[in-house]
Regions:
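Non-catalytic beta-sheet/beta-sandwich ligand-binding modules that flank or precede catalytic cores
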Residues: 1-155
Length: 155
């Protein structure tokens, strides 16, 4: 059985993007020192309307990676289930960079008329063993969506 992940969406001035993925290992990750290179993150975004988006002519050529592609991991740390750093947490939190020109991390998409929400599915693979104080965590895949939490700007 594959693992469960949770996402955190931050609302930036250029729109809402998934900035963190929390991987639930279900056991203590104390002593783990994971690196971004130990993970690959693939995302597939699909229309909630059930059909492909019309790409308007005024926007130029349609990018190939607008709905399916990979995300870069910039940082990884041991955390609790909310994504807060925690020395004896049971999760690892992956931080993902978010940029205005990289729409693959967004939870919205321009449909030709308006920005609309899209379905987002991640497939996160731990590619190498991670040592902890208790044992070693073998490579595994996380593709079961456990839910999303939105963080709005603080005023």
């Amino acid at each position: 059985m594959n693992g469960t992940y949770y996402t955190i969406t931050e609302v930036f001035d250029f729109g809402p993007h998934i900035s963190k993925i929390i991987l639930d290992y279900g056991k203590s990750m104390k002593g783990a020192a994971p690196s971004p290179e130990q993970f690959t993150v693939h995302v597939t975004r699909t229309s909630t309307e059930g059909e492909n988006f019309v790409w308007p002519n005024f926007m130029g050529d349609k990018p190939n990676d607008s709905m399916d592609g990979t995300r870069r991991v910039s940082n990884v740390y041991v955390s609790d289930k909310t994504g807060a750093p925690c020395e004896d947490g049971t999760c690892l939190t992956l931080e993902l960079p978010c940029f205005i020109m990289e729409g693959i991390g967004s939870i919205i998409k321009f449909n030709g008329n308006f920005n609309v929400f899209v379905n987002v599915a991640y497939d996160v693979t731990q590619t190498s063993e991670i040592a902890t104080d208790d044992d070693a965590i073998s490579p595994q895949t996380f593709d079961v969506d456990g839910g999303n939490r939105v963080i709005y700007g603080e005023w």
